[in-house]
Swiss-Prot record:
This is HPr kinase/phosphorylase. Mg(2+) binds at residues 168, 210. CDD domains: HprK_C. The Walker A ATP-binding motif also binds Pi and PPi. Residues 273-278 are annotated as: Important for the catalytic mechanism of dephosphorylation. It comes from Variovorax paradoxus (strain S110). Catalyzes the ATP- as well as the pyrophosphate-dependent phosphorylation of a specific serine residue in HPr, a phosphocarrier protein of the phosphoenolpyruvate-dependent sugar phosphotransferase system (PTS). HprK/P also catalyzes the pyrophosphate-producing, inorganic phosphate-dependent dephosphorylation (phosphorolysis) of seryl-phosphorylated HPr (P-Ser-HPr). It comes from the Bacteria. The keyword Nucleotide-binding applies. It holds the Pfam family Hpr_kinase_N.
Length: 319
């Protein structure tokens, strides 16, 4: 699901402090929004914010020093024509950056068309970076997943599995080993670009971990600030299964890395069977370390297969 709504008023309030901008014209259009169809087609936030460009309609148009110079250079008729064309682009809002003064014709046409016009002294490049980062998260594809999401050895890891397998207890042990909690039970996942998923905790569950028999634990209060994280990028899913399920549904040594599709992105997946006496926390950390090696191009299984083939070839040559 991708949200499609944000008003000019909400955008203005969101950055009132960081951009210190003013609302110069179009005050009556505080509810003006992005075109929902444009949002659904956008490949990234770069499609939603950029410098003034007449071939990219329906996006936030940023007017820096060069753009204002272009609009005001030439005869009065040329300037009026260039400014009038901006309205035909139907931007959700205009932003004057670089401390530029608004040309009178621009103020007039924005007021007539009820087109929100903001002005800031910040650089146009900074404004674009800030708005793109915000909109990429606001309009990101999103879903929720049941599990415990953690920072393990610097990697965002989702621990999943059926109820009763001890996911929260495992999370607690991993926290006691110096890892960090992002979210327990319900994890909000956002696709913030073409190949990145970010996981966050719902506000209601922030810093909380539920352990059966004990109840809710405030991890931040018990273990300190360093035991919790606001967000992490999802890089690995560790799925816990019972022994009978593991033997029935999974290979002991898979020949190819497992993945799970999350919001259209394949995420590495590791299966760990839960059996009495196994130290699952150590196994999870080992799986994370192995995944880090794989991301660096070191594949232990492939190395073993190559070594095995080499040994077989040597054996044949000896015969």
């Amino acid at each position: 699901m991708k949200p499609t709504v944000i008003s000019a008023d909400a955008m203005f309030e969101e950055f009132r402090g960081s951009l210190r901008w003013e609302w110069l014209a179009g005050l009556g259009a505080s509810e003006r929004q992005f075109d929902p169809e444009v949002i659904s087609r956008a490949q990234s936030a770069a499609d939603l914010v950029g410098y003034l460009n007449y071939i990219h309609p329906y996006r936030v148009q940023i007017l820096g020093a060069r753009e204002v110079a272009y609009l005001t250079r030439g005869s009065q008729e040329d300037c009026a024509r260039r400014i009038a064309r901006i309205v035909t682009l139907e931007p959700p809002m205009l932003v004057l950056a670089d401390g530029q003064a608004a040309p009178d014709e621009l103020l007039s046409i924005c007021e007539r068309a009820q087109l929100p016009l903001f002005a800031t002294r910040e650089s146009s490049a900074f404004v674009i970076d800030l708005l793109r980062a915000y909109l990429s998260k606001h309009f990101a594809e999103r879903t929720s997943m049941h599990g415990v999401f953690m920072d393990i050895l610097g990697m965002g890891v989702m621990i999943t599995g059926e109820s009763g397998l001890g996911k929260s207890e495992l999370g607690l042990e991993l926290i006691s080993r110096g890892n960090g909690l992002v979210a327990d039970d319900a994890v909000d996942l956002f696709r913030i670009n073409q190949n990145t998923i970010e996981g966050r905790c719902p506000d209601l569950l922030l810093n909380l971990l539920e352990v059966r028999g004990i109840g809710l634990l405030d991890i931040r209060a018990i273990f300190g600030e360093t035991a919790v994280r606001r967000k992490m990028r999802l890089k690995l899913i560790v799925h816990l299964v019972r022994r009978d399920s593991f033997e029935r549904d999974y290979e002991r040594m898979p020949s190819a890395p497992l993945t799970q599709d999350v919001l259209g992105i394949p995420v590495r997946k590791v299966i760990i069977q839960v059996v009495a006496g196994r130290n699952i926390a150590v196994l999870v950390e080992a799986a994370v370390r192995n995944s880090i090696l794989q991301l660096r191009g070191i594949d232990t299984y492939a190395d073993f297969v190559a070594r095995h083939h080499k040994a077989m070839e040597s054996g044949r040559d000896g015969d």
